[in-house]
Amino acid sequence: MRYRKGARDTAFLVLYRWDLRGENPGELFKEVVEEKNIKNKDAYEYAKKLVDTAVRHIEEIDSIIEKHLKGWSIDRLGYVERNALRLGVAELIFLKSKEPGRVFIDIVDLVKKYADEKAGKFVNGVLSAIYKAYITSSKEEKPSLKSE
């Protein structure tokens, strides 16, 4: 599953451009795939799945993120941080990734690549809190997802 790191990068760029430019995510996906010259079918399909999931659940994803920002609104986040968190929540919570450690590493690496180390630590902290609340909390009472 080595292709997934590249797929995450592709999906991140699509979400980033969608947030920044407000254009059709499907068209942006085609644009990024062409720019990156993606030939690997698995990478293409996984990136598409990530983008489709994030776009389909964007309101819920933003609500989940907002609950864990502690005094911040999602609109105050930079484009890199906001869209890295969206991608992470889509994959960890909605797609229920079987490799959460790898997702965390790749998401934080994306933030460091496109922003900086401090932003990477911030995203890691917020994503960890979300993951703990939705996945690793005891089975007593987890926050619910409307789409389930």
Curated annotation (Swiss-Prot):
Pfam families: NusB. Signal peptide: none annotated. One of its GO terms (molecular function) is RNA binding. GO terms for biological process: DNA-templated transcription termination; transcription antitermination. GO terms for cellular component: cytosol. Keywords: RNA-binding, Transcription, Transcription antitermination, Transcription regulation. The keyword Iron does not apply. Belongs to the NusB family. Involved in transcription antitermination. Required for transcription of ribosomal RNA (rRNA) genes. Binds specifically to the boxA antiterminator sequence of the ribosomal RNA (rrn) operons. This is Transcription antitermination protein NusB. It comes from Aquifex aeolicus (strain VF5). The gene is nusB.
